[in-house]
């Protein structure tokens, strides 16, 4: 999931275009991009889209960001979008393990009502000081948690922190990546607001990639190709293939560690190579 294109839930005319884009995933939003008066309409639009033939025929990863647990819209959102083709439910402003457990309870009821057998996973947004503080607990709260996603604007702006300062961004990225890594789930980079600043987008995506993030959110179609490019580096893919080939040879010899280009590689390096190859194919939902 190198790239994930954001689509407002109140704009159904954009759903099909997003589905046919080069993004590995689409994230339809019912939260901030939809005004209160259009919440019900957006919910219906998304529900119908998830049941459409074009979605059923597509292999695109589909995510829906619902309204927060502390809003009157949450339960209705979950009940409306709980469909078999929904890969993940994106939870905004998660601040504790209890938030995850509360969301799971609502989701389980919705799945039972809809007759869904395969559990829908959760992508938890870290976008508040409290959420950042408890990121470890959030990531490990329940097996449904697939990953942690950064929300820089909600995290930084209320505190007067410069969202474009690379040191600020790096510090939060590293903390969230470590929390995700400890729980064995992926970390996903947030949106870059300036759609005209290609260099800034690429630089931030490259920073996330170096920290082991799975991919980056895109708020405009023009950002997709840059996210895909940054998170699919040919040298990395080729090297990952060599790592796995060398691993198979070492395994046949009964060795758990081996040398490649003078560098010792063991189980963590093999897992990283597997993740790189999965991400290059746009199939990964796990960063470990």
Give the residues covered by each predicted segment.
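Expand to "…catalyze enediolate/carbanion chemistry for C-C bond making/breaking, isomerization
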Residues: 1-288
């Amino acid at each position: 999931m190198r790239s994930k294109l954001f689509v407002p839930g109140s704009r159904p005319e954009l759903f099909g275009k997003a589905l046919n884009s080069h993004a590995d995933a689409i994230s339809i939003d019912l939260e901030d991009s939809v005004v209160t008066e259009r919440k019900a309409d957006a919910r219906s639009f998304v529900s119908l889209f998830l049941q459409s033939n074009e979605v059923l025929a597509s292999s695109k990863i589909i995510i829906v960001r619902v309204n927060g647990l502390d809003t009157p819209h949450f339960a209705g959102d979950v009940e409306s979008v709980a469909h078999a083709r929904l890969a993940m439910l994106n939870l905004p402003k998660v601040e504790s393990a209890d938030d995850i457990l509360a969301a799971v309870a609502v989701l389980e009821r919705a799945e039972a009502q809809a007759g869904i057998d395969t559990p829908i996973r959760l992508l938890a947004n870290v976008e508040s000081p409290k959420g950042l503080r408890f990121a470890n607990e959030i990531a490990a709260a329940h097996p449904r948690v697939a990953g942690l996603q950064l929300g820089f604007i909600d995290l930084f702006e209320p505190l007067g922190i410069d969202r474009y300062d690379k040191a600020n961004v790096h510090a939060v990225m590293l903390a969230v990546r470590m929390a995700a890594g400890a729980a064995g789930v992926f970390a996903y980079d947030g949106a870059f607001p300036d759609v005209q600043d290609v260099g800034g987008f690429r630089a931030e995506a490259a920073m996330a990639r170096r920290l082991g993030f799975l991919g980056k959110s895109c708020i405009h179609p023009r950002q997709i190709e840059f996210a895909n490019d940054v998170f699919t580096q040919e040298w990395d893919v080729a090297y990952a293939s060599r790592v796995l080939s060398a691993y198979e040879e070492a395994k046949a010899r009964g060795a758990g560690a081996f040398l490649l280009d003078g560098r010792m590689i063991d189980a963590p390096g093999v897992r990283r190579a597997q993740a790189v190859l999965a991400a290059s194919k746009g199939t990964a939902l796990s960063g470990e």
